[in-house]
Amino acid sequence: MLDKTRLRIAMQKSGRLSDDCHELLSRCGIKINLQQQRLIAFAENMPIDILRVRDDDIPGLVMDGVVDLGIIGENVLEEELLSRRAQGEDPRYFTLRRLDFGGCRLSLAASLDTEYTGPQCLQNKRIATSYPHILKQYLDKQGVTFKSCLLNGSVEVAPRAGLADVICDLVSTGATLEANGLREVEVIYRSKACLIQRDGEMPADKQQLIDRLMTRIQGVIQARESKYIMMHAPSERLDEIITLLPGAERPTILPLAGDKSRVAMHMVSSETLFWETMEKLKALGASSILVLPIEKMME
């Protein structure tokens, strides 16, 4: 029996999204023992319980109030939402924030020798998918009638098996499609992982814990998207150098011993620093340029 006074978070039991979730919580300073393959894991340093379940169970657990929070792909969340609405339900939850991992897209894919001219050419075609409601919503907007073939796995084999003319499946790199003689022809939904919270009143102590967790998550994501930059630069070209680093806060400027014409610059940049940018910095007279990762960050 779960202790309802503790914050309950549902996340995927295994897979890439699970690994990303565990890394996020770890970087937030939450210590969880995941050595044993238990369905429930307990945080050692915070009143938090982790429910490790199938990804398609997570939206329902949040919407039904079984857990307080869930980390889930937007594609799975949207499919469950549309499914419940189709059954006349009014599912309640709210999204706390989109996360910076779990990126994928739900796409239509056809055989390499199939001519695709747009959604209209799918009229009355058989389409295999694990996301029938998202697919229907998309094709309804296009005015296309189709025959759905529901598969819960191995969707990419449907055309070769004669089950469908086209498939609608998740795509990350496209390697699986290529291996099965398919090509991506239309993206219908783009997804990332997100953090959702159940609807309804939350006890004050739980809400305070959620607020603390959100602050830490924001800090982790911001740190991953930022770099700490140090360099030596000519004093007369500081404005030009700062212009090359959009998203950077105003830098810290320190004098260099024995050289009044140059300074040391330290700054946090929220932009990716490409080699081209570093070459431009060097052309402006910057030297000893260091770009360092940031582990934690709090504004």
Swiss-Prot record:
> What Pfam families is this protein classified in?
HisG (PF01634), HisG_C (PF08029)
Q: Which UniProt keywords apply?
A: Amino-acid biosynthesis, ATP-binding, Cytoplasm, Glycosyltransferase, Histidine biosynthesis, Magnesium, Metal-binding, Nucleotide-binding, Transferase
Question: Per the UniProt record, which EC number(s) apply here?
Answer: 2.4.2.17
- CDD domains xrefs: PBP2_HisGL2
Major place of residence: cytoplasm
EC class: transferase
What domain of life does the UniProt record list for this protein's source? Answer: Bacteria
What subcellular compartments does it reside in? Cytoplasm
Q: How is its activity regulated?
A: Feedback inhibited by histidine.
Q: What does the record give as cofactor? A: Mg(2+)
Question: What pathway does this protein act in?
Answer: Amino-acid biosynthesis; L-histidine biosynthesis; L-histidine from 5-phospho-alpha-D-ribose 1-diphosphate: step 1/9
Give the GO terms filed under biological process for this record. Answer: L-histidine biosynthetic process
Q: Does the keyword Iron apply?
A: no
* Any GO CC annotation of this UniProt entry: cytoplasm
Provide the reaction this enzyme catalyses.
1-(5-phospho-beta-D-ribosyl)-ATP + diphosphate = 5-phospho-alpha-D-ribose 1-diphosphate + ATP
* Described function: Catalyzes the condensation of ATP and 5-phosphoribose 1-diphosphate to form N'-(5'-phosphoribosyl)-ATP (PR-ATP). Has a crucial role in the pathway because the rate of histidine biosynthesis seems to be controlled primarily by regulation of HisG enzymatic activity.
Q: Which PANTHER family match?
A: ATP PHOSPHORIBOSYLTRANSFERASE, ATP PHOSPHORIBOSYLTRANSFERASE ATP-PRTASE
Q: Which NCBIfam families match?
A: hisG, HisG_C-term
Instruction: Describe the subunit structure.
Output: Equilibrium between an active dimeric form, an inactive hexameric form and higher aggregates. Interconversion between the various forms is largely reversible and is influenced by the natural substrates and inhibitors of the enzyme.
Q: Which family does it belong to?
A: Belongs to the ATP phosphoribosyltransferase family. Long subfamily.
Protein name stated in the entry: ATP phosphoribosyltransferase
What species was this sequence derived from? Yersinia enterocolitica serotype O:8 / biotype 1B (strain NCTC 13174 / 8081)
